Structure formats: structure tokens, C-alpha cells
Amino acid sequence: MKGEEYIKNLGYDAFALTMTRNECDMEKLLSILPYKTIATKSGLGWIGRSALFVTPEYGAAVALGAILTDMPVEFGNPITDSECDDCTNCQDACPVNAINPQKWNDRLNREDIIDIETCKDYIIDQYKAGLGCTKCMSECKLTQEYLKKE
């Protein structure tokens, strides 16, 4: 909420879309205003084969947030197609084969690129065992390039 306060202190309206403010359907894993949509429309990156948001600099190792505001801001050109090449690391790493070979574009539904139910069920089972699954995120070659820089 510090970003919201900062913008308000500059004299603009602002509303941070926090987890509690951006209503989310946990069954479908969808929010009213999806951060990934905002980010692709702002030119920050694209949706990878894994349905995760991907940037050239960080790969899929990204956490998104959003602030609605009337403050003028600069943004890039909308990205409407995946910039992933023929790499299938995320797809190959998926333990439940939830990732489809279809590359993302902004005309597809999420279900066209990933079986979100299968993915969600696996993640829930892993969390019950005290684990998690970030295989698609960690195997993204752009994520690997970023991690090697550090």
C-alpha cells in the first residue's frame, strides 16, 4: 500500500489492488482484473507456455501487483503474442503434463494453453505434503539466465 500512499501524496487518486481488494475466484484461480492482462497490455512481458507471466529480463520469476490511478504514467506497446521461442522446458518439466504445446496470444483463453484444474490439484496435493511446485517457473530458460546473473 506504500505505492498507493505515495501516489496519493503526489495529489492523484490511487487504489492498490492487493490480494484482499482484487476479488479472486479461488476455484478458477481468476481475479476480476488480472495482473497478467494489465502487464501484457502495458508492454511489460507476455504469457509463457506455462500461463505464467514472462519478461525478457527475469523470465517467469516475477510477482505482479497493480495500482489503479489517474496519475499519468509511461507504458510500452501492448504485447499480444508470446515471445517464447521453441523452448519447451516448462512443458517438459511439468510433472502432470498440464501445459499444452499451444503458444499464448491475447486471443486465447487460459484453458487453451494450460489445464489449470490438473495444475491446481497437483499444487494442492503438494502443499498438503509441505511442498510446492514451481517447476515450470524455475525451468524457464529466461528464468535460468536471470538466476545465473546473480
What is the role of each PLM region?
Residues M1-E150:
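Catalytic cores of enzyme domains
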